[in-house]
Amino acid sequence: MNLQKISKKIDLKKGAGLIPTIIQDFYSGQVLMLAYMNKESLEKTIETNTTWFWSRSREELWNKGATSGHFQYVKSIHIDCDGDALLIKVEQLGPACHTGNRSCFYTTLI
């Protein structure tokens, strides 16, 4: 499927141009992180086979692993039934979280 067809399936209007993206370990199924993508970051992700996101705080694109070396290699991309959320299954190199934890979801609330 080409980029134009993929872009048509995604509803970027609901999230003001951003789409929440869940990152999951391809092999273990562990949820690693949640980040946001825009059209450009999704295109770069598909083109490079590594994850790219939109930083809401810095207001810029960032390639996961570019600084740390903890790249995420894309195995598959899925869209939810409403077209307003993505699930990307990756091969994760090293920890996904900036704290050094494997997953950003390491704190139990209940």
Swiss-Prot record:
Binds 1 Mg(2+) ion per subunit. Binds 1 zinc ion per subunit. One of its GO terms (biological process) is L-histidine biosynthetic process. Its main location: cytoplasm. One of its GO terms (cellular component) is cytoplasm. Its cofactor is Mg(2+); Zn(2+). It is found in: Cytoplasm. Homodimer. Its EC number is 3.5.4.19. One of its GO terms (molecular function) is zinc ion binding. NCBIfam families: PRK00051.1. The keyword Lipid metabolism does not apply. This is Phosphoribosyl-AMP cyclohydrolase. The keyword Nucleus does not apply. Pathway: Amino-acid biosynthesis; L-histidine biosynthesis; L-histidine from 5-phospho-alpha-D-ribose 1-diphosphate: step 3/9. Belongs to the PRA-CH family. Zn(2+) binds at C81, C97, C104. The lineage of its organism: Bacteria, Bacillati, Bacillota, Clostridia, Eubacteriales. It catalyses: 1-(5-phospho-beta-D-ribosyl)-5'-AMP + H2O = 1-(5-phospho-beta-D-ribosyl)-5-[(5-phospho-beta-D-ribosylamino)methylideneamino]imidazole-4-carboxamide. Mg(2+) binds at D80, D82, D84. Catalyzes the hydrolysis of the adenine ring of phosphoribosyl-AMP. Keywords: Amino-acid biosynthesis, Cytoplasm, Histidine biosynthesis, Hydrolase, Magnesium, Metal-binding, Zinc. SUPFAM superfamilies: HisI-like. It is an enzyme of class 3 (hydrolase).
